[in-house]
């Protein structure tokens, strides 16, 4: 996968690290939450790929087989995402208000749950569980019976752990806020990240078959929009000041523009675009929508993590590109290495459907565009 690698990547990674240092020196209270949004987005890709991989193990078909290689390769990079999360655990008092003495009092139940030591332990358990699941799924690849067994148990464990992770990592940034479906929102966040990333990798090959990728992505986007709409309606009808304040912070000023940008690009644009069968089944159009969906996960993470913080605009100019370049390219290098290894072993472990060669690379087919 030489096209996934470039001699410029190390230079870009170092430039990202330099931007992080500058952003931290300007305002650590801006840099650290931005880094959290970045690593939450990056970790959503391998974990989301692992979840989608489990779904493809249970519901198998021609469209699922072609995704196994990128999904598996991404899932196996979960330990790298865990390593990238370590700075967040070190910087807890600067990121989470409940992690220092002057922080807001979250109440007795949340106070017992939201302690630095317990938070670090839970985060370590999440990544350990997801890593074990990824390895288990990889080991079950050649045995259909083991695939179904691993995926069935894994989906239950994933749904529970990812729901708690979303509450811990993002919802607890505002301790007084609570949403009964926040965990489900985070599940769709990760699933969208994983599925759209896998589609982007597969469809980046000219002539790759599209199967029913457009309909599948549209279905998940509709679920994502439905979950967000339901949370808004529930909080609006409850009319609780602490919960309403969470939305008010995201509807004002620049964050309001960011929110409407997310709605327009993540729901309105792809919804109407994929009403057209030509766009829904075209490789290039699907590739653009899938790549856009991956990128918008970072915007969504920022909207979830940053609005109720005192953000310094100058620091943000360094924090956003710096964290994306540094953490993103480190993970990308790990993914490229993992993809090479998985592709080399693919022909020995899993038969591939028509439209894919022995290495798992899509091959040109008539009618692809």
Question: For the regions a protein language model found, what residue spans apply to each?
Answer:
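Hydrophobic cores of alpha-helical transmembrane segments in multi-pass inner/ER membrane proteins
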Residues: 44-55, 82-88, 123-135, 188-203, ...
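Extended, compositionally biased non-globular segments
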Residues: 252-304
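N-terminal regions that are enriched for targeting/export leaders
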Residues: 1-49, 331-369
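Extracellular/periplasmic helix-loop-helix junctions in multi-pass membrane proteins
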Residues: 174-178, 240, 278-286, 302-319
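Long, contiguous internal "core" modules enriched in hydrophobic/ aromatic residues
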Residues: 2-19, 113-262, 279, 349-361, ...
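Transmembrane alpha-helical segments of multi-pass membrane proteins
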Residues: 70-83, 148-160, 215-222, 288-297
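Membrane-interface transmembrane-helix boundary segments in multi-pass integral membrane proteins
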Residues: 5, 180-186, 242-263, 270, ...
